[in-house]
Amino acid sequence: MTSSTGTGGTGSAVGTGSTNTTVGTGTRGAGGGFHLPAGSAAAGPYALDIDPRRAGWGYSSLRVVELEPGGTHEFATGESEWIVLPLSGGCTVEAEDRTFPLRGRPSVFEGVSDFAYVPRDADVRITSSGGGRFALTGARCTRRLPARYGPASGVPVELRGRGNCSRQVNNFGAAGVFEADQLIAVEVLTPGGNWSSYPPHKHDEDRPGVESELEEIYYFEIAPHLPADGDGGAVPGLGYQRVSPSGPGSATDVLAEVRDGDAVLIPDGWHGPSIAAPGHDMYYLNVMAGPGLERAWLICDHPEHAWIRGSWEEQPVDPRLPLYHAPTVEGEGE
């Protein structure tokens, strides 16, 4: 078995201006805080390796594996269900005597990807003839569902918010869209200069029909600036992520400069905004899971900021969106 890893993301360096403010005694990740700069949570074959043990919580996991052309990665799913999602490149996923060729995509900024779901208590093999970077989104679970393929054409692409709060959400693993036991996973794309995850919201209490209790991971990729004349090469981008305590017992307090390949752990608290710097589109992959009997994404807006939703009624969606559409059934595999 061969497996190749790098420092995470698309290779952009994490600058020295990265800011991470944490207070209290809340959950800590592999890097000692809630903000994990690219490479700080690498382990073994993974450029990023977040599991319940490392995060100090109960359910959510995220791994990123980078394969050279012809590379292979094998893993056991253990107590978790997983979705294998190409971030760049394509691959073949083998599990449960099933084989799922994934077309993938050139990058997260260039298309919706197909994906493969693999159940708990299974052995999985990922092979990539052309090489690429692949996210493994996971959640501890009880039910054992069948391995299956998720077509890109079946991914609902949602335009959320208005004005400079416009963003695109690829709901590939959302509750009510794709069946899983506990895992919820979506992609969010924010045009440069816009805010997303806004208004700030939380999902850290189990209130049936009102709010879900969900741990969450944000994994970021930031589009570089490409000078028109090619002079000097690509300029790395950045963004910002805010998380604030939501009440007694919530100690998650983060103001982080996030760059390509960074991750932020959110065990609790108000999270948002996620801010994309002008000229640099922002991508983040959200992975969520929790103890609730109902697999649902129910959120509570911050009361001081919830009014912003009413202001969107008179504003258009950012004309830069969508950055792309899901392919038609006929277009897949072309």
Specify the residue positions occupied by each region the protein language model found.
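Intrinsically disordered, low-complexity terminal tails and inter-domain linkers enriched
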Residues: 3-28, 227-233
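Catalytic core of Fe(II)/2-oxoglutarate
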Residues: 251-265, 270-299
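Conserved metal-binding segment of the jelly-roll/cupin
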Residues: 109-129, 139, 257-278
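Double-stranded beta-helix
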Residues: 132-172, 278, 285-334
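Glycine- and acidic-residue-biased ligand/ion/polar-headgroup-sensing regions
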Residues: 78-102, 118, 192, 204-262, ...
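A short glycine-rich, His/Asp/Glu-containing loop-to-beta-strand
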Residues: 40-74, 166-217
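Hydrophobic, proline/glycine-rich low-complexity stretches
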Residues: 2-3, 24-74, 81-90, 316-319, ...
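Extended, compositionally biased flexible segments
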Residues: 54, 61-127
